């Protein structure tokens, strides 16, 4: 690790060295191509894509799962959605009506670091993927529904 990278990680008090998404977001993990990176978020391809375009939008700071969020996180979710849609457009997805944006509830999320699934085209999800990313089910919630729930709490 370079001194510069080490300093960046050291300064980020919300970094969890054991979290793969923290390591990817802070460029401590080789092999993950960042499709988007800004001061707060990164976006990269899912390692097990369910459709042609399956990306994850992840905060650089370690944030727990969608179950740990409060009203204060609504803007974060909205920004994550914007990054997801922008990444789709940069990758030639033109039909933003045929997408799915959402989160898995614990214990159905494999990584306990908030990550937005960005899927397109949603109409091409296979049978198993339609179950895994089933809209507003016991295990998966759309970003819009999560925002509604957080604002109502």
From Swiss-Prot:
InterPro entries per record: HIT-like, HIT-like_sf
Source taxon at top rank: Eukaryota
Domain HIT: 20-130
Active site: 115 (tele-amp-histidine intermediate)
Keyword line: Cytoplasm, Hydrolase, Nucleotide-binding, Nucleus
GO function term, MF aspect, one: adenosine 5'-monophosphoramidase activity
Position of sequence motif Histidine triad motif: 113-117
Reactions it catalyzes: adenosine 5'-phosphoramidate + H2O = AMP + NH4(+)
One GO cellular component term noted in the UniProt record for this chain: cytoplasm
Binding site residues for AMP: 46-47, 115-117
Cellular compartment(s): Cytoplasm; Nucleus
EC number(s) per entry: 3.9.1.-
Function: Exhibits adenosine 5'-monophosphoramidase activity, hydrolyzing purine nucleotide phosphoramidates with a single phosphate group such as adenosine 5'monophosphoramidate (AMP-NH2) to yield AMP and NH2. Hydrolyzes lysyl-AMP (AMP-N-epsilon-(N-alpha-acetyl lysine methyl ester)) generated by lysine tRNA ligase.
Self-association and partners: Forms dimers to octamers and even larger oligomer.
Sequence similarity: Belongs to the HINT family.
Protein name: Adenosine 5'-monophosphoramidase HINT3
Organism field: Xenopus tropicalis (Western clawed frog)
Name of the gene this protein is made from: hint3
């Amino acid at each position: 690790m370079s001194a510069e990278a080490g300093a960046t990680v050291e300064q980020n008090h919300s970094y969890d060295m054991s979290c793969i998404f923290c390591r990817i977001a802070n460029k401590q993990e080789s092999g993950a191509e960042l499709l988007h990176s800004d001061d707060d978020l990164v976006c990269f391809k899912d390692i097990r894509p369910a459709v042609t375009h399956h990306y994850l939008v992840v905060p650089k700071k370690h944030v727990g799962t969608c179950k740990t969020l409060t009203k204060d996180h609504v803007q974060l979710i909205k920004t994550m959605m914007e990054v997801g849609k922008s990444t789709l457009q940069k990758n030639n997805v033109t039909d933003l009506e045929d997408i799915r944006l959402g989160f898995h509830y614990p214990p159905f999320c494999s990584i306990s670091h908030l990550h937005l699934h960005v899927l397109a085209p949603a109409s091409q999800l296979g049978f198993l993927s339609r179950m895994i990313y089933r809209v507003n089910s016991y295990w998966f919630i759309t970003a819009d529904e999560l925002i509604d729930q957080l604002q109502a709490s």
